[in-house]
From Swiss-Prot:
Signal peptide: none annotated. One of the primary rRNA binding proteins, it binds directly to 16S rRNA central domain where it helps coordinate assembly of the platform of the 30S subunit. This is Small ribosomal subunit protein uS8. GO terms for cellular component: ribonucleoprotein complex; ribosome. GO terms for molecular function: rRNA binding; structural constituent of ribosome. Part of the 30S ribosomal subunit. Contacts proteins S5 and S12. InterPro entries: Ribosomal_uS8, Ribosomal_uS8_CS, Ribosomal_uS8_sf. It comes from Chlorobium chlorochromatii (strain CaD3). Keywords: Ribonucleoprotein, Ribosomal protein, RNA-binding, rRNA-binding. Gene3D superfamilies: 3.30.1370.30, 3.30.1490.10.
Length: 131
C-alpha cells in the first residue's frame, strides 16, 4: 500500500524507533527526507544518517541519539502541516515552547528551522515540530 504522506511516515518511524530503544531505523529515501535528516543532525537530535543504495531502492539509515539516562534525545515529534490541511506561516513565525523546541519549515531557502526563517525573513510550510 503506497504511503500518502511520506513526511508523516518519516516522523512515525523515528518516533517508534525511539520508543522501542532501537539504535537505528531505515526510511525510504527522498531528497526532502535527506535534507530534514541533515537539519536534525546539525541540531543534535540524531547521531548520524547515511544514504544506502540497494538494487531495489535507496533508503536512509538514521542512527538515533539517546541521553545518558537512556531516554531518546527526541522527546516530541509531531506533524503540523498535513495533506488535508496545509499550514503556512510568514516571516514572523512564533517560537515553539519559548525557543526550547523547533519548528521545521520547507521554504524557498530549503528546509530550515523557525529561528533561521526569522533571521532570513522568510516563511514557508511548517512540516513538523520537535522537542
Amino acid at each position: 500500500m503506497p504511503v500518502t504522506d511520506s513526511i508523516a511516515d518519516y516522523i512515525t518511524r523515528i518516533r517508534n524507533a525511539g520508543r522501542a530503544k532501537n539504535s537505528t531505523t531505515d526510511i525510504p529515501y527522498s531528497k526532502l527526507k535527506e535534507n530534514i535528516s541533515q537539519l536534525l543532525l546539525e541540531k543534535g537530535y540524531i547521531k548520524n544518517f547515511t544514504v544506502i543504495t540497494t538494487e531495489k531502492f535507496p533508503f536512509l539509515r538514521i542512527d538515533l541519539k539517546y541521553m545518558q539516562s537512556g531516554e531518546p534525545a527526541i522527546k516530541e515529534l509531531t506533524r503540523v502541516s498535513k495533506p488535508g490541511r496545509r499550514v503556512y506561516d510568514g516571516k514572523d513565525i512564533k517560537k515553539y515552547l519559548g525557543g526550547l523546541g523547533l519548528y521545521v519549515l520547507s521554504s524557498s531557502k530549503g528546509v530550515i528551522t523557525d529561528k533561521e526563517a526569522r533571521a532570513q525573513g522568510v516563511g514557508g510550510e511548517i512540516l513538523f515540530r520537535i522537542y
